[in-house]
Amino acid sequence: MTPFGYLFIDIDDPRATPSPAGRALAFGCARSRSLTPEEIGTPAHAHIVADTVRAAMREAQVGAEDVALVIVKTPVTSHIPATAGAVRNTRVTSAHSKAVGALGAGLALGEVPEARIVREAFDTDHTLHAKRAMVFSGSELDCVEIMLLANRPGAAGELTVHTGFLKDVLDAGGLRALFASAGCRIGEDGMLADPQKVVATLIKSGAAPDGRVRGLRTTMKSSHLDMDKHVRATMSGVAGSILGHARIFISANTVHQAPPGGGLCACIVRGGH
């Protein structure tokens, strides 16, 4: 609800010492080559995502077990003309591109079997999902861009990153569990007792395919307003009631990023576990 942004800056500080907790926040970035129009939305696209995630892990000097969150930006369509004689794919939707990106990230992290990265699975086989990926798509790029957040052993600093799942858009308990696991205290009123420890909160929230929440119909799939806007507004209220403010990054559509109707939440805390 509050317009703002998070800025990540990598600074070489000779005064920095390893975290007393033994690990601290590290991030890595990577960018793939340009995809051809024929590759976008295909298993080859997913493998390019996986390779780019692995490159970001190398840049951050971490293994898959250290990764807390992978942020993926992936192309929807391409402005590049189709190769002569090639058959261009039918239009790749935002949801389809996010599905490909999520399964590619899951492949790189060992969460999705390579044998199940097939065209028929994308945005269809919802038994498959990554566990630590938030995926975004756009027509303004023709490549895959990755930003990866991890807790690297021996890293300097006092920040750590933590990830958890949400059952649905009303799962306040899931958010409280995330903050508690990060070392924050929950007050008797259900709000954070030490909100100053939380320096960033990121949420990817979704809606079940039938639009129901806990068995009841909702208006989220009505035609007058995009469902993602309903989801973001609902999640803003739920998360804001715990944090005590609305400076929260919230996005919608969790295809292959969580079980259907569920979501992913992450926080960066200072002096946490």
What are these regions (language model features)?
Residues 1-273:
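Terminal domain-initiation and capping elements
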